Amino acid sequence: MKSPKLYFYDVGLAAWLLGIHRPEHIQRDPLYGAMFENMIIVDRLKSKYNMARPVECYFYRDNTGNEVDLMEPERHQVHAIEIKGGATIGADYFKGLSRFKNAFPETFLDGTVIYGGDHSQQRTEWTIRSWRDVEDENR
């Protein structure tokens, strides 16, 4: 049985309900990565809704736990997006994207990592986007 992911529309409310009442405490919380992922996905959805663009998004998880956080379809392929809260790019950030690309090469269109750092860049195989630049991408 497949289980859906649930997202809070208001990440600030989610943090408050988790007992995180001061902004400086958020990055030390064990759920920071999940809240960062939630924020990025919900902001992408809001942006698309506001521009009257079709909103379709999924995630991928295989039976061994490998996953890609966000899959945005385009025709018969998908943009695979991994979301990481860390401010420094690590090799492990690309693991889920690589596994998906190798398992489904005909479906894979491109791969992007959105991370908590400040510098966007293009690498040979992947696009790396700072969370600060993601909104510009949606315009």
Question: What do these predicted regions represent?
Answer:
Residues F108-D118:
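Low-complexity, intrinsically disordered Gly/Pro/Thr-rich segments
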Residues H76-V78, T107-D110:
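Short glycine-/polar-rich loops that comprise or flank the Walker A/P-loop
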Residues R61, K84, I114-Y115:
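Short beta-strand/turn micro-motifs composed of small residues
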Residues M1-V78:
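Accessory nucleic acid-recognition modules appended to NTPase machines
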Residues G116-R139:
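Domain-level recognition of nuclease-like catalytic cores that cleave nucleotide substrates
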Residues H79, I83-G86, S98:
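Terminal-proximal interaction/regulatory segments of ATP-powered molecular machines
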Residues A91-P105:
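Short, charged, amphipathic alpha-helix that recurs within catalytic cores of restriction-modification
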Residues W16, G90-A91, S120-T124:
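Switch/connector loops and helix/strand junctions flanking conserved nucleotide-binding motifs
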